[in-house]
Amino acid sequence: GNYAADGITTATLKKKDGFIVVKFEREGYVTLETKIFTTDKRKAVSYTMRRDAFFDVSVASGLVNKYFSVKISKDLYTVDESGKRNTELAWKMIHQVILNYFDEIQTTDMASGFIQTPWLYKSFPEADKQIRTRVSVKESNLGGDLTFQIKISSEVAPLIASQRDESFQEIDRIVKDLEPMISEFQARLGKL
C-alpha cells in the first residue's frame, strides 16, 4: 500500500524477501526515489535532496497558459471618419516587446490579427527538466476598443524527452528572464 509521511518516520517490513520504494518529493527540490530491501542491515537511512535549479530560475505566475487582455492605448491606433481602424503602430509596438525576449516571430498576420513565436527551449540538466515558452497574441475588439488577447505558454518535460509535444505539460511557472515581458506588454501597449 501507499504510506505518506512527513519528517522522520519509522517503517517495519514483514516480508523477508521484500523491499519498499521510498520517494522523496518537495516543491523546489529534485524528486528522489530509491529501493530499500529487507536484507539491508542499516538501522537508519538518510538522504539529502538537491535544490531544483528550475525552481531557482523561474517564478510562479497566474497569467501563464491562459489569455489575458490588454486594452490598447488610443495613442497606438487611429480611427478614420468611415470607422476604419489603423492599428499599424500598435502592431509595431507588440512586435518590439516580443522581440525583446524572443529572437524571432514564427507567425504574424495583421489581417487576421494573430502573432505567435516559436517555442523557446531552456534546459536544466541538474534537475533533468526542460521548459519551453512561447507567446500567442490575438487581436480582439472588446466593447469597440482595440484589445490584444495575449497568452504566454509555459510547459515542462523531462530532459530526455527530446522536443516531442506529448512529453510537455503545462506548468504555472515562467523563466525569470521572461517574467518582465508581462509588465512590458501592459505598460507599453495600454492597460489590463
Question: Where do the model's predicted regions map?
Answer:
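Short, ordered, surface-exposed loop/turn motifs in non-cytosolic proteins
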Residues: G1-N2
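Ser/Thr-rich, low-complexity intrinsically disordered terminal regions
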Residues: D6-T12, K16-L192
